[in-house]
């Protein structure tokens, strides 16, 4: 069965005019929701993501509660790594921990390839369930970017400064580029499978790329990103790039064959456009504002919307994920305000 969906988000991704500004929030499904916390009392992240019915419920929950214009698949960026031979465990209070960190070219050469239908069928089944039976808004598939995935694989877990990753990049360039190629292959195959299963857009998250300077990005990271976006582009769905703490890289992302440049709060939308970012833009509210009084939130959001609406192709989002402390009612009120305020302004 083919469902009719609200395409406002997709139109904005394509740079088309919309009647109002579409909105969704990174980590909209999860820790701030009482329903989710009850589920986590009984099930681990692994158990939720391996159960298509439960995972679909968690993914859809914020669509029902907040009236957002897109759903994003509930899963972890580390989900595909076991398929290529990475021993990863998500530890409470720590994050991803890898038992066999990459230390050499030989370690890279041991990595395998992903076959999504065999290796992550539960993810594809979740997408199919959501897009054929449950959602009336587009579903966003996603992947971690090669640099962020490589950082976990080299550091063995989260890091404050990623010294080991950058040292490996500088000291072992042959092994580094081999790792980038392996991860680019995995990301391409993984995203294409999500699109084939029903995802209507995809986003690549590069959580730690802000630690890299522009020159190093161009040499060590950008070639893999160019190949990913060029190959996935053939699937015909909008593609979004989002990095954290990387305002110095937005022009590098703009050069990639993608549709939407994601911004965090460190760079105002109008400044990004002044720098030459003319593709669709997504962002860029500091999630900390969600803990402020409503009057403060409203004025801040007006400012963001007024910048974003100056040209077609704008999607409201946060610059990072929703905090656990955020009141779900605030997110519901925020979506309503975004829709109503932007509709009034765009109708003028």
Curated annotation (Swiss-Prot):
**Which key words are in the record?**
Cytoplasm, Decarboxylase, Lyase, Porphyrin biosynthesis
- Keyword Ion transport recorded: no
Q: Which GO terms describe its biological process?
A: protoporphyrinogen IX biosynthetic process
Read off the Pfam families from this record.
Answer: URO-D (PF01208)
**Database matches in NCBIfam families:** hemE (TIGR01464)
What is annotated about its quaternary structure and interactions?
Homodimer.
Give the Enzyme Commission number: 4.1.1.37
Q: What does this protein do?
A: Catalyzes the decarboxylation of four acetate groups of uroporphyrinogen-III to yield coproporphyrinogen-III.
GO molecular function ontology, one term from the record: uroporphyrinogen decarboxylase activity
The entry sums up its family as follows: Belongs to the uroporphyrinogen decarboxylase family.
PANTHER family, A to Z: METHYLTETRAHYDROFOLATE:HOMOCYSTEINE METHYLTRANSFERASE RELATED, UROPORPHYRINOGEN DECARBOXYLASE
Under which pathway is this protein filed? Porphyrin-containing compound metabolism; protoporphyrin-IX biosynthesis; coproporphyrinogen-III from 5-aminolevulinate: step 4/4
Gene Ontology cellular-component terms for this entry are: cytosol
Location relative to the cell: Cytoplasm
The kind of enzyme this is, by top-level EC class, is: lyase
Q: Which reaction does it catalyse?
A: uroporphyrinogen III + 4 H(+) = coproporphyrinogen III + 4 CO2
| Identification of the protein by name | Uroporphyrinogen decarboxylase
Residues binding substrate are 27-31, 46, 76, 152, 207, 320
Site feature location: Transition state stabilizer:
76
What is the scientific name of the source organism?
Answer: Bacillus cereus (strain AH820)
InterPro entries recorded for this chain?
A: UROD/MetE-like_sf (IPR038071), Uroporphyrinogen_deCO2ase_HemE (IPR006361), Uroporphyrinogen_deCOase (IPR000257)
């Amino acid at each position: 069965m083919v469902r009719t969906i609200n395409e406002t988000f997709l139109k904005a991704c394509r740079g088309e005019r919309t009647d109002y500004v579409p909105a969704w929030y990174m980590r909209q499904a999860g820790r701030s929701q009482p329903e989710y916390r009850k589920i986590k009392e009984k099930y681990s992240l692994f158990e939720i993501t391996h159960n298509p019915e439960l995972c679909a419920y968690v993914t859809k929950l914020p669509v029902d509660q907040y009236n957002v214009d897109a759903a994003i698949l509930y899963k972890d960026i580390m989900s595909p790594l076991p398929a290529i031979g990475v021993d990863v465990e998500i530890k409470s209070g720590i994050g991803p921990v890898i038992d066999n960190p990459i230390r050499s070219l030989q370690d890279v050469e041991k990595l395998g390839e992903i076959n999504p239908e065999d290796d992550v069928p539960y993810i594809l089944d979740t997408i199919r369930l959501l897009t054929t039976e449950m959602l009336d808004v587009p579903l966003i598939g996603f992947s971690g970017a090669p640099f962020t995935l490589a950082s976990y694989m080299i550091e063995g877990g989260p890091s404050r400064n990623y010294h080991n990753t950058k040292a490996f990049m500088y000291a072992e360039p042959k092994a580094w580029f081999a790792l980038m190629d392996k991860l680019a292959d995995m990301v391409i195959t993984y995203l294409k499978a999500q699109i084939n299963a029903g995802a209507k857009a995809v986003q690549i998250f590069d959580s730690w790329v802000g630690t890299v300077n522009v020159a190093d990005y161009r040499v060590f990271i950008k070639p893999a990103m160019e190949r990913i976006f060029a190959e996935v582009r053939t699937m015909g769905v909008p593609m979004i790039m989002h990095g954290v703490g990387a305002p110095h890289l937005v022009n590098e992302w703009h050069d990639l064959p993608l549709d939407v440049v994601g911004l965090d709060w460190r760079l105002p939308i109008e400044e990004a456009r002044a720098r030459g970012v003319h593709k669709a833009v997504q962002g860029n509210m500091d999630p900390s504002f969600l803990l402020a009084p409503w009057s403060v939130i409203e004025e801040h959001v007006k400012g963001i919307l007024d910048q974003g609406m100056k040209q077609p192709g704008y999607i409201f989002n946060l610059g990072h994920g929703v905090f656990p402390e955020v009141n779900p009612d605030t997110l519901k009120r925020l979506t309503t305000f975004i829709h109503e305020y932007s509709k009034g302004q765009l109708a003028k």
